[in-house]
Amino acid sequence: YKSTPAFGFDRLVATLVSNEYELDGVPGFYTKKNNTYGINFNKKTTGILIPICSITDKIEGFQIRLDKAFDDRKYIWFSSSNHFRGTSVGGPAHFIGNPLSKTVYVTEGALKANIAHVLSGKTFIAVPGVSHYKSLESIFTQLKQTGTTDIVEAYDMDKYTNIHVEKACMNMICLANNFGFNVHRLKWNDKYKGIDDWLYSMNNK
């Protein structure tokens, strides 16, 4: 992963432009008053860039894991929707693993999915937030075409104590059922909140 810059934004944009990269319509970039490009980085957005990848391994956007959370948020999108001629990232789901896998796990958060994939070798989809189950529709459509048969719900263990997370789980399960997948629910020792934490503990026994 790469860190976001804390300064040198104009120089970074100038380098991209001089290398003839097209920045129109790219989330995170916008047009400034002097008709040059700007990039939506600032001192509050310092952190780690986490690529959000499609089932074909193309980057569709970035999340930033913030060094210092603000407004109770640890993650934000690299987006420029609130700037002139800026673009929203749209909140896509993240995919990592083999697109031909018969079984695919669904969790929340790209970084968590990446860690779980490395620790288990399994294929994962990550929604950007538990309530964003509709972001799965495109990937589910593609997985159905490539032969996936089973979806495993692997949301955090607070799904058993948080009614909002449980509702989000059920929405995802209903969506997977509508696509004709066999759906399973994964449960582990609840002292480990996320599947990444649980897999890490299992790998270190």
Positions of PLM-derived features:
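Extended, non-catalytic subsegments within catalytic or DNA/protein-binding/adaptor domains
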Residues: 2-5
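Generic structural signal of hydrophobic/aromatic residues within well-ordered alpha-helices
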Residues: 8, 12-16, 195, 205
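TOPRIM fold recognition
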Residues: 101-104, 111-205
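Phosphate-handling DNA/RNA-contact segment within nucleic-acid enzymes
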Residues: 11-147
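N-terminal structured subdomain of primase-like DNA metabolism proteins
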Residues: 7-8, 21, 154
